[in-house]
Every structure is written in C-alpha cells, then in structure tokens.
C-alpha cells in the first residue's frame, strides 16, 4: 500500500495484493495459480483522474486487448478504481521429443474492473474470462511467448485479441 502524489495536489492511495503459488504435479510440469487485487482511492475524496485509473494488463487477461475492457465513456475506455485478476496456468514441458527449449502452456484467466466514481451508470462490473493455449520458447535472444486465447465471458464493448506474441518475461 502506498500514498502517492503524482504531478498534482491529488493524493492517491494505491493498494495491491498479489498471491501466487507454484505446484509441480509431475516432473517438469509446473502449474501456477495467481490472484491479484488492486485498488486506488483519492485521500481527499475527489474523483480519481483518468490518468490515475487502473486497467487490466493484457498479460493478466489473455484474449482481450490490453486496457480495452471495462467501463467506457463514449468511445473511450476509462478504467476503474478496482481491478481483480485470477490466473491458472499449467506447463506441458518437452512435448516435442528433440526440442528441450519449447513448452506448451494451457491457461484460464478471469478478471474484473470496476469503480467509476464520477458516473456509476458507466460502471460495468461483469467478470471477463478466457481460456487458451500458448507456446513458450527459450531462444538465444530471450524467451518468446505465443498465445492463443478464446474469451468465454465478455461485454459487447470489449475488444478481443485472440493471438498475442511477447518477447521477454514478466516478474
């Protein structure tokens, strides 16, 4: 939890809670369960500025374009004051017999974004979810990730992203 003053006189409390557990069910198979909750609130009671609102990152909700789900005002996604995500991932290692650097990944993601303080009619608090399969490839230039995801629950205004390619890793 932190209080931050960012480029103005508005002081915002930004609270985070992250939980992650790893489990090896058999040799080289690692399954991960992750839960994240984040909230932002103005200590002065003012509405949180658009630039300070929270969005769901694409790596936490595959199958949707990063920052393109949740409350909208006209054609603009406006984020929210609260975000929660749940991710379940399992790795199927060495599926290709002679290739040691490629793993197949199965995943299920769910997330929610809510809390529009200036207009509650814009607040769409439906849970979005997706399932998919990915390929993790450790190359000499670094890890490459290819993922294909299919949204299960969504809102009509959400923007889908079935395929995603990433270079590098997140911590």
Task: Tell where the protein language model's regions lie, with residue ranges.
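C-terminal outer-membrane beta-barrel translocator/porin domains of Gram-negative envelope proteins
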Residues: 6-9, 13-102, 106-110, 114-116, ...
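Short glycine-rich, acidic/polar surface loops and turns
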Residues: 89-91, 128-136
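Conserved active-site loop/cleft motifs that coordinate metal ions or position small ligands
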Residues: 105-107, 143-149
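Outer-membrane beta-barrel transmembrane domain signature
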Residues: 110-130
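Short beta-alpha connecting loops at secondary-structure transitions
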Residues: 128, 147-149, 159-163
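Outer-membrane beta-barrel "beta-signal"
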Residues: 135-142, 160-171
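A short, acidic, flexible beta-alpha connecting loop/helix-capping segment that sits on the rim
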Residues: 150-154
């Amino acid at each position: 939890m932190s209080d931050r003053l960012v480029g103005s006189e508005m002081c915002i409390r930004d609270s985070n809670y992250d939980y992650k557990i790893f489990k090896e069910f058999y040799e080289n198979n690692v399954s991960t369960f992750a839960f994240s909750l984040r909230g932002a609130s103005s200590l002065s009671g003012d509405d949180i500025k658009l630039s300070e609102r929270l969005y769901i990152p694409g790596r936490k909700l595959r199958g949707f374009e990063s920052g393109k789900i949740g409350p909208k005002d006209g054609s603009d996604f406006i984020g929210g004051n609260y975000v929660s995500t749940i991710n379940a991932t399992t790795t199927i290692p060495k599926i290709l017999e002679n290739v040691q650097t490629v793993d197949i990944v199965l995943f299920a993601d769910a997330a929610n974004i809510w809390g529009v303080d200036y207009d509650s009619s814009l607040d769409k608090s439906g849970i979005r979810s997706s399932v998919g399969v990915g390929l993790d490839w450790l190359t000499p230039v670094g890890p490459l990730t290819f993922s294909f995801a299919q949204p299960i629950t969504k809102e009509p205004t959400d923007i889908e992203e079935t395929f995603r390619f990433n270079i590098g890793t997140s911590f």
